[in-house]
Amino acid sequence: MGDPLLPGSTGLGSGGTAAATGGTGTTGTGLGSGGTSGTERPPSPARLTHTSEKHPKVTLTELNMLRRHRELCDVVLNVGGRKIFAHRVILSACSSYFCAMFTGELEESRQTEVTIRDIDENAMELLIDFCYTAHIIVEESNVQTLLPAACLLQLVEIQDICCEFLKRQLDPTNCLGIRAFADTHSCRELLRIADKFTQHNFQEVMESEEFLLLPVGQLVDIICSDELNVRSEEQVFNAVMSWLKYNVAERRQHLAQVLQHVRLPLLSPKFLVGTVGSDLLVRSDEACRDLVDEAKNYLLLPQERPLMQGPRTRPRKPTRRGEVLFAVGGWCSGDAIASVERFDPQTNDWKMVAPMSKRRCGVGVAVLNDLLYAVGGHDGQSYLNSIERYDPQTNQWSCDVAPTTSCRTSVGVAVLDGFLYAVGGQDGVQCLNHVERYDPKENKWSKVAPMTTRRLGVAVAVLSGHLYAIGGSDGQCPLNTVERYDPRQNKWVAVNPMSTRRKHLGCAVFNNYIYAVGGRDDCMELSSAERYNPLTNTWSPIVAMTSRRSGVGLAVVNGQLYAVGGFDGSAYLKTIEVYDPETNQWRLCGCMNYRRLGGGVGVMRAPQTENYMWCAK
């Protein structure tokens, strides 16, 4: 059998299709003579139903032109000294606020110039533009004025878009400010998401300036949550004391109110006595001393603990975000595929997500800046240099990434120092040693030093600031050689080879080793596996997988090593197996929805907000 990952040996060919037409006579339309049937039927009335898809857009465009030329305008909005011309009927159709203003008994219903107060004039102009164009750009510079304006005008769609934008901007340095902003404007969903984000990232949030500026009520709301994500209750106490000491004069009166929400009974005895009990501010407050005594009793009298249960003795149970694995493209049932699915180890469940715009086998996949990149591949007919990028927050692929300088399939892709590297592969003419890297800030690829050996079906890995190119084929035979790239010197050097020749192998870094599994040698698909120790520059074997797998994906998810799909010599695989380094054993742990040979795999953190769509629309 030929190499199943090389398009020339897949058995692909152009198939013929035939169409036949039958003699059905003449069909009567009411516009001419009918057929020769012996039974005459009265002609049906002529009818053509038409619904124009472009009519709404054209109409809005013309209405906006009338507004721009101040023609047929029947109202002028005076906002912050700026005059905005408009048509009442358009404003009323888009905004409940304007509808009530112009159709009721309010004085404004009879005025040709209406003054709108407490709203930013630039925001108002953007919102009126949206009413006429259905287009708006929300960005960091305008969202804080757009959202209040949209709330006032009751433009719910814009409120939702602003909240969506703010959800995507959440980080530990601004989540408290966004939370307060959401609370002020009654954006309940944004408030809930900001709360969840704050709880999950509390260890970073507590270091921010926003945290130190919190009013006491908001501080209490945060630290009383059962879902606060902390390693120990000591972090909560330290956070509270940092907040207090930021303005001791004004805040010491609130110490007992806040400290009652710190779960002192869950502290270690050493920390409780040595740190909490000895703190001068705590010792000077009677209510705080009582809280410390309560915690001491809980720790010293274990037999009494069943009678002392309460909110302060309840362990926190944070909701932890795990990692998820994506399987992208590949070869299935004789053709390249565009389908993508994700695996959640916590539920042991595979679900389909949005497919790529192109079918891709031999695709290189990597994650950069929380976005999944699919590089090159083969679509069943052509070698590709195009790239797609997946955003898990929106469940959408975008194609605005600059293409690689060469078409590449069976390419190795990895991320090093904020750059995306594309290594080797083939372009339909020859096997490649070219290497290029992508700068996401510039949306540009640039070439770096080529490898010393041409490699298709190469595996790549990043370890200790170096990029490794492992195995593959030079176009004639599989390789066991390995070379390492140093970006500081822009140079490749050879390291010790693997014990087995492997092309289309799987590769991943796990516990500071590089693992190489499966692939194909000169004769057959492989189940064997080995790992590389960079400290000793040596390869050593590990136990073989349960199945032979060429074109296998290998990835580390939540601290476990997974082998995904591949080809066993007779069938495409959808099984996955996981490796346990302590027992040196592989075990099967489920199946994908699709069989995949030569698909890419990537690992991402589950989105920090809950506003994402894993499932394909």
From Swiss-Prot:
- What are the BACK domain coordinates in residue numbering? 175-277
Identify the keywords attached in UniProt to this record, alphabetized.
Actin-binding, Kelch repeat, Repeat, Ubl conjugation pathway
State the Gene Ontology BP annotations.
negative regulation of synaptic assembly at neuromuscular junction; protein ubiquitination
> Which residues form each disulfide bond in the chain?
none
Region span, Disordered: 1-55
TM ranges: none
What's a Pfam family in this record?
BACK
Locations of Gly residues compositional bias?
Answer: 10-37
The residues bearing each Kelch repeat, given as ranges, are 324-370, 372-418, 419-465, 467-512, 514-559, 560-606
Q: Per the database record, which ranges form the BTB domain?
A: 73-140
Task: Recall the GO molecular function terms of this protein's record.
Answer: actin binding
Please name the pathway: Protein modification; protein ubiquitination
Q: PANTHER family under this entry?
A: KELCH PROTEIN, KELCH-LIKE PROTEIN 20
What is the purpose of this protein? Probable substrate-specific adapter of an E3 ubiquitin-protein ligase complex which mediates the ubiquitination and subsequent proteasomal degradation of target proteins. May have a role in synapse differentiation and growth.
Protein name listed in UniProt: Kelch-like protein diablo
Cite the source lineage: Eukaryota, Metazoa, Ecdysozoa, Arthropoda, Hexapoda
UniProt lists the gene as: dbo
